[in-house]
Swiss-Prot record:
Record field: catalytic activity: ATP + protein L-histidine = ADP + protein N-phospho-L-histidine
Name assigned to this protein: Sensor protein kinase HptS
Listed PANTHER family: SENSOR HISTIDINE KINASE YPDA, SENSOR PROTEIN KINASE HPTS
Transmembrane regions: 20-40, 222-242
Biological process according to GO: signal transduction
Organism: Staphylococcus aureus (strain NCTC 8325 / PS 47)
Its membrane topology: Multi-pass membrane protein
Matching Pfam families: HATPase_c, His_kinase
Origin superkingdom: Bacteria
Listed EC numbers: 2.7.13.3
Length: 518
């Protein structure tokens, strides 16, 4: 007996599979989905902020360039050695700086002159060099450098979304940072874990704006939540195990009793009827087990008898398929032909090998009718070599009938019987007519042989129902028994014959069960 797990164990496992684990799985999926959506939203936000910041910086740069272009002629008329012209220059540059949406500082340097709005003396080395311009004045050419300390947009992003900004050059040197974790002038090394970032090119000098966010705190919160969920799951498993085991023991006591009775019934030791302790619908199963046990005992004896008969029929099938007399006669014919007609002998050997391959094929007990007819034609061809072409075979069949499936060797015994018992010294004509009607294949095998007398015909008809060991007419008897096993009582085999007028065999094969191997 196979060692199965008790039903209460399966019930307990089913409780986990159907309640606890799905709930936990939903929570896990929800948590993962939340984090996936969170990451997606953050990426979208960073992308949006990068675009907005890039647009803002480009706009500021464009305004500065436009201002410089428009006032270029005015600057050429000013002389920075003149106090009034210096004041005018400062006023114009401050006007430029104050119009921009950013905190900017300028430095105008030239021969013996330095002008700036960096009154607090901030270190411009920690600022981003926004742009550089050459301005021609009346007395000389000066260099204008504009530094960016911050922009309102980057400050808002840092304050509202905790997203920080960097500006790096083409060698990843940090030119600007609003995060204390980075120092201007150092190399920028992207963090491999816990950071989301996106960058965009700012100008032709390959300066890049990088906006990033630190999500370490979010990841740590997620890990903490997972630990809490794991602890809750362990508690649920322990509680569910104890509860399910107690409930399963109460609910499955009668089921275990029934399983024990099934085991006894399987080993044919059930004994007399005993009711279950609890009056429930399981009593119906208990009654059915005893009724089924009694029915099985009756069927077992019948099946054992049927199996013995099937084995006997299979043995006879093997004996008939090998056809020792036919093989012996054919081998003698081949021996005779080797000296007279080697080519014809080779043809006979090929036909015989094809017949043996067909009859000994064991992968399926069903074949197409067309294969069976080819086998019959080869069989008759070999017999004609022995009997000097005295056997004429005619097959009348539609193309549809030829593609129907029947049991293997279901027609050949009819032809074998016609040749063996119908032939005399004259030629023998055998006609096979195949028709389809109402899901049945009707086979008519007619010959013009010597036929049978009434008494002989009666004897042959009775032999069809005899045991395979109790008759010498193995071919028809075996065919009839095989058809009854494979097709049931729907198969019919009728024999009609008159002395010196030939024999007619009518054979009906149901097609609805023809595809089932036996």
């Amino acid at each position: 007996m196979t060692a199965y797990k008790p039903y209460r164990h399966q019930l307990r496992r089913s409780l986990f599979a159907s309640t606890i684990f799905p709930v936990f799985l939903v929570i896990i999926i929800g948590l993962v989905s939340f984090y996936a959506i969170y990451i997606w939203i953050e990426h979208r936000t960073i992308h949006q902020h990068v675009d907005e910041s890039q647009s803002s910086l480009h706009h500021t740069e464009k305004q500065i360039q436009t201002f410089i272009t428009q006032h270029n002629n005015s600057f050429q008329e000013l002389d920075l050695t003149n106090h009034h012209d210096v004041t005018a220059t400062k006023r114009e540059l401050l006007k430029l700086i104050h119009q921009q949406p950013a905190t900017l500082y300028y430095e105008l340097s030239g021969p013996n002159q330095f002008i700036t709005n960096n009154y607090e003396h901030l270190n411009t080395k920690n600022m981003y060099l926004f742009s550089t311009h050459q301005l021609k004045f009346k007395n000389s050419t000066y260099m204008l450098k504009i530094y960016m300390a911050n922009t309102p947009r980057l400050s808002e992003i840092k304050k509202d979304n905790r997203q920080f900004a960097l500006i790096v050059d083409q060698y990843d040197n940090i030119l600007y940072a609003n995060d204390d974790r980075f120092t201007i002038g150092e190399k920028y090394r992207p963090q491999q874990f816990g950071f989301m970032n996106e960058s965009v090119k700012l100008n032709h000098a390959d300066h890049r704006l990088i906006i990033y966010k630190d999500i370490h705190e979010n990841i740590e919160d997620g890990i903490t939540l997972l630990i809490v969920m794991a602890v809750v799951l362990v508690l649920l498993v322990i509680f569910g195990f104890i509860s399910a085991d107690n409930m399963a023991k109460r609910q499955t006591k009668d089921i275990e009793t029934i399983i024990q009775k099934i085991y006894y019934a399987k080993n044919r030791h059930l004994g007399t009827y005993t009711p279950l302790k609890n009056n429930s619908e399981l009593e119906e199963i208990n009654n059915y087990i005893y009724d089924l046990f009694e029915s099985n005992e009756q069927l077992i004896h019948s099946i054992e008898h049927t199996e013995r008969r099937l084995r006997d029929i299979q043995l006879k099938e093997i004996e008939r398929q090998f056809q020792p007399h036919f093989l012996f006669n054919t081998m003698q014919t081949i021996q005779y032909l080797i000296t007279l007609s080697p080519k014809l002998a080779q043809t006979v050997v090929q036909q015989l090998s094809q017949m043996l391959r067909y009859s000994l094929r064991t992968n399926s007990h069903t074949v197409e009718l067309n294969e069976e007819l080819n086998y019959i034609e080869q069989y008759v061809a070999i017999q004609n070599i022995r009997f000097d072409d005295m056997i004429k075979l005619h097959i009348e069949s539609s193309e549809e009938a030829r593609h129907q499936t029947i049991g293997k060797m279901m027609l050949q015994p009819l032809i074998e019987n016609a040749i063996k018992h119908g032939r005399d010294t004259e030629s023998l004509d055998i006609t096979i007519r195949l028709t389809l009607a109402r899901q049945n294949l009707h086979v008519l095998v007619c010959d013009n042989g010597i036929g049978m007398s009434s008494s002989r015909l009666q004897y042959v008809r009775q032999s069809l129902n005899n045991d395979v060991f109790d008759t010498k007419h193995l071919g028809l008897n075996h065919l009839h028994n095989k058809a009854m096993i494979q097709y049931g009582s729907h198969a019919r085999l009728h024999i009609f014959s008159k002395r010196n007028q030939g024999t007619l065999i009518c054979y009906k094969i149901p097609l609805s069960r023809g595809n089932v191997d036996v």
